[in-house]
Amino acid sequence: MSLIEAAKHFTRAFAKARDLKFGSDARDHLLLGVEKLADAVVSTLGPKGRNVMIELPYGPPKVTKDGVTVAKSIEFKDKWQNLGAQLVINVAQKTNDVAGDGTTTATLLTRELYRESIKALSAGLDPNKVRKGMTLRVDAVVKELEKSTKKVSSPDEIFNVATISANGSEKIGHLIADAFKAVGNEGVITVAMGKKFDHELETVQGMKIDRGYISSYFQNDTKSMKCEYENPYILITDIKINSFAQIAPILEKIITTGRPLLIIADDVEGDALATLIVNKIRGSLKVVAIRAPGFGDNKKNTLQDIAVATGGQYISEELGLKLEEATQQMLGQCNKITVSKDDCIILGGAGDKDAMKARSEDIKKQLSNTQSKYETDKLRERLAKLTGGVAVISVGGANEVEVGEEKDLIDDALNATRAAIEEGIVAGGGTALLRASAVLEPLKKDKGLEERTGIEIIQNSHQTASHSHC
């Protein structure tokens, strides 16, 4: 083996080397990471919580009180501390995915549980029995919390929850309450970065698709830079259209009716796009094309939703259907479409009401069976588009930093309000946890030392959560 080859071999072996720690040494190093990260996150807790400024790779810093945002921004140079931090980040992220808020409290509880558990292990207690005492008694606390919940449904209750969740901002409280009033408690409310000084609430009735026209040549109103048609046909497919021959047969039938056509496809390009634009400019065909929204299964589901809402048929090669064989009966219809460079709004779809109701019920069943926040948001969005409308809160501010800070605040308040509508509210400030943990005291009887310790760890963490809000 040459000297160079030996050096390469040594470098590879060194790169794969692992630093091993065991027992209390490993736990103590992890605890440092848990403590440091939790200190930063918990500083944002409650109405008196502090803002945290986060340096970004580019642009101005981000100012936020959102626990999971702070947690995810932290990375330590020490890899052991970083491992400990990752434990807490995972908890915060999971809490955010499931509940949408409460990440700071989750971080606080995680720190206390880990800290107290290390004390138990250092005392020589059996970790499996301690864990058993903790996990079994958590169920009892959850049941007690469920008993003390109060349902939230009226506009005033929604306003109060939103205001409290937004650090007492009645302006944000009214904004969120108005949004729920506009689209209903199951409707979709999205928060976007605005371009004005003040916050704005826009309600879109009908079905809004987050895709604009493929080419600006499809505009028919140069002032508003939009394309608007009344009583159009709608072609719905997940097929990429790159040849005019694919759509020539159906276009011939559409031209004879004199009605406009909205094409929703995976993409429209090549001579197909060029021919559509030429015919539109010449006035021989009223047409506009947009790309299908979403990706993967979500794209297919959304296209099927559009088909149901407009009384059309979803044309897909997976279903054995080809564009060349599309008939006029396969096309959807609606009263009006408005297409901008960013989105498309379908008003007055001609879908069968019973079919739309059945589709909505199916989505509701899927909602009850998912725990993923991403899937929940997508299902809610689909449901709202089928049943009513979408409310968009555009966040305003004097500059990018202020807009970002306000957006985080509104996001948290919206998520907390939505959770309150779904599952109710309990006494705040850690009081509900403290009261619920009282149910654990009788359960400590006739238990071994390890299980009793596990129960006490849960109780102590709840007491700390309550005191931290003071």
UniProtKB/Swiss-Prot annotation:
CC per GO annotation: hydrogenosome
Places the protein is found: Hydrogenosome
Alphabetized Pfam families for the sequence: Cpn60_TCP1
Gene Ontology terms, MF aspect: ATP binding; ATP-dependent protein folding chaperone
Keyword list, A-Z: ATP-binding, Chaperone, Hydrogenosome, Nucleotide-binding
InterPro entries according to UniProt: Chaperonin_Cpn60_CS, Cpn60/GroEL, Cpn60/GroEL/TCP-1, GroEL-like_apical_dom_sf, GROEL-like_equatorial_sf, TCP-1-like_intermed_sf
Chief location of this protein within or outside the cell: other
Domain of life: Eukaryota
PANTHER family in alphabetical order: 60 KDA HEAT SHOCK PROTEIN, MITOCHONDRIAL (PTHR45633)
Function: Implicated in hydrogenosomal protein import and macromolecular assembly. May facilitate the correct folding of imported proteins. May also prevent misfolding and promote the refolding and proper assembly of unfolded polypeptides generated under stress conditions in the hydrogenosome (Potential).
Family: Belongs to the chaperonin (HSP60) family.
UniProt-listed NCBIfam families: GroEL (TIGR02348), PRK00013.1 (NF000592), PRK12849.1 (NF009487), PRK12850.1 (NF009488), PRK12851.1 (NF009489)
Protein name: Hydrogenosomal chaperonin HSP60
